Design a protein with these regions (language model features):
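Catalytic activation segment of kinase domains across protein kinase-like and atypical kinase folds
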Residues: 205, 219-260
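Long, compositionally biased intrinsically disordered regions
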Residues: 347-350
Length: 362
C-alpha cells in the first residue's frame, strides 16, 4: 500500500522508506528523504485522520488557501516563504492530497529544515516567541476572507453547545459518577450566564469572524534551531472561521501555568500572571492593528471560556465513561477537569489584573 501512496507524487529521485515522525496523535506522520543529483531533500508524509476530519477535500482547500496567502504575504515583506508557512506538495494529478484504493487520504508537505518543535515551555522566551508566532498568524491573515473556510470540525469552540453536551452527560449519568462530583458540576452551573458572552457579541455583529487556528499550543509552532524564533505555525487541520479571543485563550489555558494537565494536588495548580503578561505582550505586538478595540477587551474572556470549556469536556467524558480522551488511570479525566476549574478560579481572582495587562499592550 505504501508503494501505491508514494507513487502518487513525482519525486525526481529515489525515495527512502517512510519513518514515523513527531509526537502528534491525530494524523499518522512520516518523514521521507528523496535522493537526487542536487542532494537529499526531506518531506513530511501524513495520513489524514478521516474519522476526525470527515471532509478531507474541504480541509485541504482550507490549508492550501491559507498557506498560499501566507506565502504571498511573506514575499511582500521580504521573508523566506519556504520558512514562513507550510508548503503542500501536489500529486502528479495536481491534487492537494491522494486518496488510496483502501480509502485512506494522504498529503505531503515540504520539510522545514533547521527547525524544532517544543512539547513544553522551557523558558519565558519560548512562550513569548509562541505568542509572536500566533499573533503574527492573525496579523498576516487579517484580510483573508474567513467566510470561505470550511468548518472542518463543526461546533468546535461553540461554548453553549459544549455546555449542552455537559448537561446531557450529567443528566444521563451513565457510569453513576455524578453524585461524587457534585462540587465540580455546581462549579460549571454557577457560571452559566457567562457561556454566551462571546457568541452573543458575535451574533450582534460586534465581533468579527477571523481565520483562527483553534489549537494554539506551543507544539504547533516550528522554532528556528539557531535563533529560537517562532517561524511557522503548523497543524492547520483545525483552521476555521472563529474568534481571535479563542485562539488567544487556548494558548493561555495551555501555557500560563506550571502544572501537569492532570495534577491531583490542586495547591500546585496556579494561573501565572507573569506568563499571561509575557504572552499578551508578544501576541498583541505581533498582531499589530489586526484587532478591533472590543476584540482586545474580550481576550481575557477567551482565556476563561476556553479553560472552562476544556474542563467541561474532561468532566463530561469522565461522566460518560472516558471514551473520548485517552486515560492511563480511572480518575485522570476528573483530575484534568479539576485543574481547569482551579485555573478558572485563579483567573477570576486576577480578572482586574488581566484587564490591566490588556490595556497596557493594546
Amino acid at each position: 500500500m505504501m508503494n501505491e501512496i508514494l507513487a502518487a507524487w513525482q519525486w525526481n529521485g529515489s525515495v527512502s522508506e517512510p519513518i514515523p515522525y513527531g509526537e502528534g496523535h491525530i494524523n499518522q506522520t512520516y518523514a521521507i528523504t528523496v535522493m537526487s543529483k542536487p542532494g537529499a531533500k526531506r518531506y513530511i508524509l501524513q495520513k489524514i485522520n478521516t474519522d476526525t476530519f470527515k471532509d478531507p477535500e474541504g480541509l485541504m482547500e482550507n490549508i492550501c488557501g491559507v498557506t498560499e496567502f501566507l506565502r504571498e504575504r511573506a514575499k511582500q515583506r521580504g521573508a523566506d516563504p519556504a520558512r514562513a508557512t507550510l508548503h503542500v506538495v501536489p500529486t502528479k494529478e495536481e491534487k492537494p492530497y491522494y486518496q488510496a484504493t483502501d480509502g485512506s487520504c494522504w498529503r505531503v508537505y515540504e520539510f522545514v529544515e533547521n527547525t524544532v518543535c517544543l512539547q513544553q515551555v522551557q523558558s519565558a522566551e519560548d512562550f513569548y516567541q509562541s505568542a509572536v508566532a500566533f499573533g503574527n498568524f492573525q496579523h498576516q491573515l487579517a484580510e483573508y476572507p474567513s467566510h470561505t473556510l470550511h468548518e472542518t470540525i463543526p461546533h468546535f469552540h461553540d461554548t453553549p453547545k459544549r455546555v449542552a453536551d455537559f448537561q446531557r452527560a450529567v443528566a444521563e449519568d451513565r457510569m453513576g459518577r455524578a453524585a461524587q462530583v457534585q462540587r465540580e458540576i455546581e462549579f460549571v452551573r454557577a457560571r452559566e450566564a457567562e457561556y454566551h458572552v462571546m457568541v452573543d457579541l458575535l451574533a450582534a455583529g460586534k465581533l468579527p469572524l477571523r481565520v483562527t487556528h483553534n489549537d494554539t499550543k506551543l507544539n504547533n509552532i516550528l522554532f528556528d534551531k539557531t535563533t529560537g524564533e517562532g517561524l511557522c505555525v503548523i497543524d492547520l487541520d483545525t483552521v476555521m472561521p472563529g474568534l481571535a479571543a479563542n485562539d488567544f485563550g487556548d494558548s493561555i489555558r495551555f501555557g500560563a501555568n506550571h502544572c501537569a494537565e492532570d495534577e491531583a494536588d490542586l495547591s500546585k495548580v496556579n494561573f501565572s500572571m507573569e506568563l499571561f503578561e509575557i504572552y499578551t505582550k508578544g501576541f498583541l505586538q505581533a498582531a499589530g492593528e489586526a484587532f478591533t478595540p472590543l476584540e482586545k477587551q474580550t481576550l481575557p474572556w477567551g482565556a476563561k471560556l476556553m479553560t472552562m470549556e476544556c474542563g467541561m469536556r474532561f468532566l463530561a467524558d469522565y461522566l460518560e465513561g472516558d471514551h473520548y480522551f485517552h486515560i492511563n488511570y480511572e480518575t485522570q479525566n476528573l483530575n484534568r477537569a479539576r485543574t481547569q476549574f482551579k485555573l478558572t478560579a485563579d483567573m477570576e481572582r486576577n480578572w482586574d489584573a488581566m484587564q490591566k495587562v490588556i490595556e497596557k499592550y493594546k
